[in-house]
Amino acid sequence: HGSGLDHRSWALQSRWFAFHGFSVFAPDLPGHSLSEGNPIKSIEGMGQWLVKALKVAGCESIHLVGHSQGFLVALEAASSLGVKLKTLTAVASALSIPVNDSLVETAKKSPEDGADMLLKWGFGSHSRSGISAVPGMQPIGIGRQIMSSNPLAVDLVACTRYINGIECAKNIQI
């Protein structure tokens, strides 16, 4: 999942894949929503945690999908999965994600304000009304609640410090 987010980011996609024959594993990183423990402060550490979680879950044929920070974590994990890795998919990501200093500082001082900044940028000007084309859904409100209760600043700093994307990508053989 992306910075400050959790498994709910993948609710609709998880459902689709599950109904099309895939076993879906969409974990919350430690310190995020339903996961216990302290937040992991580096993308490398998050990738190692994911590899261990996949092993504990008994995953053998692995298709990794990651959004933003989640792709960096998936990339780290993918570089050490070997033949178990079947595909790796990036959604709105890159091999490095330097985060604006103002956003990081805002998220450190006020997770709510940091979440608001990300949501405004992510959803654009039409998000100001807070409505959704999907009945019963309020992605801005839901996103604000999730991000402000998770370690957003820790995640943003981890993204900023991550520099191993190219090397990890070179190690992946699918």
Which role fits each region the language model picked out?
Residues 11-19, 23-69:
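Active-site loop/oxyanion-hole signature of alpha/beta-hydrolase fold enzymes
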